[in-house]
């Protein structure tokens, strides 16, 4: 798992320093705060202390990166939790990697999309930019669930569609190889 997380950071860092898919982010000041928000992938389950993607991203970017990952979380829970995390940390940027547990549990993807949309709207209303990271469906080819592209287009987000899919298909990033 730690190789997967390290690969995630290596692929995320250039994005945070520039642009993606013709959308740009405001530069993050040295004192700026990045909120890595999501489930077990964000929390770093399976990685040693200091090896979660938020920890490695903080080291590489020299920015404050808050690890707001909650193992086992579904988007309905994340929607509520974000309203508590944002006033506590005042992030400039949110890396939103959420919905994998919804997919694994076969929850209604329309509801997942609604919860993610509410999180994005809340973040924007409170002055934070959002980078949306796509989560693969449960299928042989690990294609990203279409709701992520729809949300990215609707909210004009920087979107990383295939990051997890690409990492999951690459044996180099698997800790159990």
Located regions from the model:
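Serine-esterase "nucleophile elbow" of acetyl-processing enzymes
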Residues: 21-74, 79-90
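C-terminal motif of bacterial Sec signal peptides marking the signal peptidase cleavage site
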Residues: 16-19
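Bacterial N-terminal signal peptides that target proteins for export
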Residues: 1-9
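Alpha-helical cap/lid subdomain in secreted, periplasmic
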Residues: 21, 28, 59-60, 80-177
């Amino acid at each position: 798992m730690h190789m997967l997380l390290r690969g995630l950071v290596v692929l995320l860092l250039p994005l945070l320093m520039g642009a993606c898919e013709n959308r740009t982010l405001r530069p993050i000041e040295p004192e700026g705060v990045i909120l890595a928000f999501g489930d077990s992938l964000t929390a770093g389950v399976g990685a040693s202390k200091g090896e979660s993607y938020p920890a490695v991203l903080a080291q590489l970017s020299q920015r404050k990166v808050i690890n707001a990952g909650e193992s086992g979380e579904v988007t309905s829970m994340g929607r509520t939790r974000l309203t508590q995390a944002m006033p506590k940390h005042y992030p400039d940027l949110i890396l939103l990697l959420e919905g994998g547990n919804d997919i694994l549990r076969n929850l209604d993807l329309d509801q997942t999309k609604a919860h993610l949309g509410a999180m994005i709207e809340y973040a924007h209303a409170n002055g934070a930019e959002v980078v949306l990271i796509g989560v693969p469906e449960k299928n042989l080819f690990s294609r990203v669930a279409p709701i992520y592209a729809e949300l990215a287009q609707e909210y004009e987000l920087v979107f990383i569609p295939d990051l997890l899919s690409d990492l999951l298909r690459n044996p180099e990033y698997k800790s159990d190889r």
